[in-house]
């Protein structure tokens, strides 16, 4: 097994994989080495990199909260309940902090991000949202 981070390790310019890197990983994949992408990114943006590889891999996304199989099915998902989300949103509102959460919308439809924008966004939120 070979586990790789995306940003600054496997992917350059956001989604691109260098041809030499792609060829080396394909060689390992063909030799039955499991290639795993491990990232803090959401699955949808990780898919762009997987598509550039040319073969399917395991993907550990959202800092380990979501694990996808090579066939894109979900192996593991750690989610907050609706009650927990409502409690977190109430706390964030009381503190004047905007709340942004990610969900696995792949094959489910809908948005990847759930945003409670009752509070103004800070610059760091804009940066994160634009990058992901």
Could you describe each region identified by the protein language model?
Residues 1-14:
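Asp-based phosphoryl-transfer active-site loop
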Residues 19-127:
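Active-site phosphate-binding/coordination module
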Residues 131-132:
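Anionic-ligand binding region
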